[in-house]
Curated annotation (Swiss-Prot):
This is 1-(5-phosphoribosyl)-5-[(5-phosphoribosylamino)methylideneamino] imidazole-4-carboxamide isomerase. Its main location: cytoplasm. Pathway: Amino-acid biosynthesis; L-histidine biosynthesis; L-histidine from 5-phospho-alpha-D-ribose 1-diphosphate: step 4/9. It catalyses: 1-(5-phospho-beta-D-ribosyl)-5-[(5-phospho-beta-D-ribosylamino)methylideneamino]imidazole-4-carboxamide = 5-[(5-phospho-1-deoxy-D-ribulos-1-ylimino)methylamino]-1-(5-phospho-beta-D-ribosyl)imidazole-4-carboxamide. One of its GO terms (molecular function) is 1-(5-phosphoribosyl)-5-[(5-phosphoribosylamino)methylideneamino]imidazole-4-carboxamide isomerase activity. It comes from the Bacteria. It is found in: Cytoplasm. HAMAP family: HisA. Gene3D superfamilies: Aldolase class I (3.20.20.70). GO terms for biological process: L-histidine biosynthetic process; L-tryptophan biosynthetic process. InterPro entries: Aldolase_TIM (IPR013785), His_biosynth (IPR006062), HisA_bact_arch (IPR006063), Isoase_HisA-like (IPR044524), Isoase_HisA-like_bact (IPR023016), RibuloseP-bd_barrel (IPR011060). One of its GO terms (cellular component) is cytoplasm. Its EC number is 5.3.1.16.
Amino acid sequence: MGPREPFVVFPAIDLKGGRCVRLRQGDFGRERVYDADPVGRAREWERRGARALHVVDLDGAREGRPVQLALIREIARAAGVPLQVGGGIRTLEDVRAARRAGAARVVVGTAAVADRDFRLRALEELGADLVVAVDAREGVVATHGWQRQSGVGAAELAGELAAEGVRAVLFTDISRDGTGEGAALERTAEVAGIIPTIASGGVRGAGDIRALARTPGVVGAVVGTALYEGQATLEELLAAAGG
């Protein structure tokens, strides 16, 4: 076995109405605006040492089609680091549009869960640059901007994706997202034991990052609220990750 890849801390830039916001537990009615200038925020994260950014088109997630691609293109030009982009990407044309906008990796959620043929075609198109979002509430995958329960277990879906050749998933425990209550280590570890996993939801500081970085199969973490609320600095999280 070769050396473990460096653990990546992804500062989150969640876009809604052209602004950088955070939602609590995916609830569009519980929104907090953190920055009216997402492009400037992306530059700031890069300046402070981020090796990649996680950008979510929340308007797209709710509408079922990409909405913020022009802004994502601006962020990609300004940031100087790779973007992992998701939100409303449900067709191959959406995948290609995200790539044209500057996405280094594309996160596909709802369509990949609901339509196996689509995810196989997306995998053929993107290869290792495809990340499938496994968003779970109480261990059951949710879709359509987290508004619907799929009835599929997170571990079950992870197993299917691994068998198909998907290289990574983004696992979000919805109950923790935007809360700063701490990462869902046990549930994340269950998925990461099946397929390489980027953790998301609830990370509150360096202790969570250290614990995730030590968990077999966890290759990164998306951090939003903890950074925007000042619970931790990016520098602290990068140091905890070993980078």
